[in-house]
Amino acid sequence: MFSRVFLVFLIFIFPLAYGEDLRTIKPERVGMSSERLAKIKPHMQRYVDEGKVAGIQTIIARNGKIVHFEQVGTLNLDTGSEMKHDSLFRIASMTKPVATTAAMILFEEGKLLLDDPVDKYLPAFKDKKVLVDGELVDATHPFTIRELMSHTGGLTYGIFGNSPIDQQYREAMFGENNTFNFRNIANNDTPESQLKTLDDLVAAIGPIPLQYQPGTQWVYSLSVDILGAVIEKVSGQPLDTFMEERLFQPLGMKDTFFEVPKDKLNRFGTLHTIDQTGKLIVVDRPETSDFANNVSFLSAGGGLVSTASDYIRYAQMMLNGGELNGVRILSPTTIDLMTRNQLTYDQQLKYDPRPGIAGTTGFGLGFGLKTEAPKTASGSKGNFRWAGIFGTDFWCDPKENLTAILLMQMIPYPQNVRAEFKNLTYQAITEMN
């Protein structure tokens, strides 16, 4: 069984009308083609037929109406149960935008400022040092809430690189002489995390030097997990309680949680990888998953389980400028702030250096952004998105009033499927805004 903390590091009573699903309509009513959208399902089926994934689910909404919702393949490889509209997925780092949105609720209430130093709320991060060319130097400034949200505060993840700071993170998470290696995933042989709560995380990495001076680089990191600890401190509530009361209930997200309830386990699938022989195998099972058994580590960076129907409500709220079905979560001005680029041009080039993409992609508060229309891919300037390590992905296109979600449970996932799904979505548009 995978450790829950390992999985999430990879990588988050109202009136009945609030819980209603977004209405499904004929695509032609919102400038899309039914015939062209029909290309998506057989394309995804090929991935299943070739044994590259167990199952895939896709959902698309335009102008606030669902125009496509399909799934192919198997939810649970052990039982053979099929994927359905209400299937539950480990959404991994798609948790990050949701948690950042929760923090912005506190921002709007005047309970925190984006330029507040993190050590104002979490003293373990006071007086940080930075490791520069093997020497410890003082940080130029305390890293801030904004730098947590934009992954520019000097933190790292510890599991994607091999710098001296990465090594210290791994020791803090998995112990000295740990055997962590992504190649071990296929053998279901990953080390157990020592960290059981957000407080454990803060205490463990608080003393570790920063990897770079705050504000100078973009490095994907545990920042949003630390933001989760800030949310708990400022709100005075556990992270799951705050997010349930302030986000999930108001938006009608009845199937989004950090721990899968026992009565919903039959809708929660297996997690998969490809073993050394090329065979699709199970590496996490619903009945033994740490996403379903006495969850104590509430990972704002990757701990949520959700459905396509729930997550598209969140995405549509963001696309609507902070409101869904008459329920306002945030002001349009706050959504605008969250989707502004926080990176310098040099940081953008390092953030996504791919040919044709470099310099057109930035990062806001919780989201990757398109600062320019891409030259080699579908999409519009102003798109915002994020994804997860198990093959989950979503994006919002304000120009075309379009949002789409791709869900699977695969590590590693097929690299091209996200771009292919995006192209298949945009080719179905017949009337541009």
Please provide the spans of the model-predicted regions.
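Short, well-ordered beta-strand elements
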Residues: D393-W395, N401-M410
